[in-house]
Amino acid sequence: MDRKTLDDTSRFLSHVLRHQPEAIGLTLDGEGWADIDALIAGAARDGRALDRALLGAVLRSNDKQRFAFSADGQRIRAVQGHSHAAVAIAYAPAVPPAVLYHGTARRFLDSIREHGLVPGSRHHVHLSARRATALEVGRRYGSPVLLEVDARDMHLAGHLFHQAENGVWLAGQVPVRFIREA
């Protein structure tokens, strides 16, 4: 399977499984799961060739583990990053490491200094336990800036953290007082 096909399919899956399932007539349940046969049929109506083998190849090749199959292999979902109102994955609360990281672009710093980290159109702020991962995310948006989040103190102050299946840390928001430039 060539890299371009895998990347294009991953982008398509991100779009329909996180943000706009209705674009292909797909329905997500409250945990974000979609029936694989319905996804394949919706993709075909959209002019996209998609089958179980390609879905499996995308899941295996995606280093960020953005997607997961259900235990019975009949459903698929994005593990985090949803903006769709119908999806509210019930992540278990988790105790974070002392420090987490967030990568962003320099142009967003003024807003972050004023409002903290907010989820925007998504349901959660995404954080990483790894500096390199956070910097990589920041590079997607321009000149990267690495922010350090005092997750231990934030957690002790009563803020909830969750960890998605792929290791991404999630928070509802991160107040300014817990953020510093790394």
From Swiss-Prot:
A Pfam family that the UniProt record links to this protein: PTS_2-RNA
Q: Which UniProt keywords apply?
A: NAD, Transferase
N-terminal signal peptide:
none
What are the protein's GO molecular function terms? Answer: NAD+ poly-ADP-ribosyltransferase activity; tRNA 2'-phosphotransferase activity
Asked if the keyword Transferase belongs to this entry, the reply reads yes
Gene3D superfamilies given for it?
3.20.170.30, RNA 2'-phosphotransferase, Tpt1/KptA family, N-terminal domain
Assigned EC number: 2.7.1.-
Superkingdom to which the source organism belongs: Bacteria
Keyword set includes NAD: yes
Matches recorded under InterPro entries:
Ptrans_KptA/Tpt1, RNA_2'-PTrans_C, RNA_2'-PTrans_KptA, RNA_2'-PTrans_N
In UniProt terms, what function does this protein have? Answer: Removes the 2'-phosphate from RNA via an intermediate in which the phosphate is ADP-ribosylated by NAD followed by a presumed transesterification to release the RNA and generate ADP-ribose 1''-2''-cyclic phosphate (APPR>P). May function as an ADP-ribosylase.
Question: Which family, according to the similarity comment?
Answer: Belongs to the KptA/TPT1 family.
How is this protein named in the record? Probable RNA 2'-phosphotransferase
Q: Which organism is it from?
A: Pseudomonas paraeruginosa (strain DSM 24068 / PA7) (Pseudomonas aeruginosa (strain PA7))
Q: Which classification does the entry list for the species? A: Bacteria, Pseudomonadati, Pseudomonadota, Gammaproteobacteria, Pseudomonadales
Give the gene that encodes this protein. kptA
